[in-house]
Structure formats: C-alpha cells, structure tokens
C-alpha cells in the first residue's frame, strides 16, 4: 500500500473542522454523537481522509461505548497500532495504515473471534454501502 504524506495545511483545506481535529490532531468525538455509532447499514467503512478500506460492517457490533466498534479491520495493513500514553494511561492508538489518520483506540475487551474492540471515531470514517 502506497503511503500518503501531506502537510497539515493541505489536510485542513480538505477536511471539515471536526474531521481535521480528530484525524490529524488526534481528537475524540463525544460518545453517542457520531454518525455511525448505531448504523447497521451493510458496507465497508473507509478512511475519510484517503479512502482506504478499514472496517467491514460484518465486523461491527454494539459495544455500548457510544462509538462505532469492530472486532477486526478488513486486513492487517489497513490500520497500524501505536502505544498511546496520553491522559495518564496506556492505550493502543489505531491509525490509518495509508495516511496515518487518527481513527481511535483498540481494547482487549471485544467479542469473539478476536477478543478486540476497535473503538473508532465516526468522523474518521466514510461508509460505502454494499450494493444489494
């Protein structure tokens, strides 16, 4: 997968204020406020910044957290995971594997088959519905 590396000013021009704050500055949307937290539409969730396929709706589940949650990405290269020591705790940050957009965090409290909960900001995603 070819990487995308753009200056922040370019991203600022292309994204909404909320998307820029979350994806490029590492922000977090309020729980239960995002467009996709309760969506059940079948499809693929893509990175809002670069269009890379990230998560399949087949891996989405209601974690009760208020953010879209998935038990796995579409493939291992779609996302990358980094240690995050912000806010006085240790978490694993999830970023887009292609453009390095901040997506959310992954926690070890998800359902089978992976036991993982990818807790993702709606503003970092764009759902492309499956054709019926």
Swiss-Prot record:
Residues engaged in binding Zn(2+): 47, 50, 96, 99
According to the entry, every stretch annotated as the MsrB domain falls at: 8-130
Protein's UniProt keywords contain Metal-binding:
yes
- Where does the source fall among the domains of life? Bacteria
Identify the Gene3D superfamilies for this entry.
Peptide methionine sulfoxide reductase (2.170.150.20)
Name a GO CC annotation attached to this entry: cytoplasm
What is this protein's record name?
Peptide methionine sulfoxide reductase MsrB
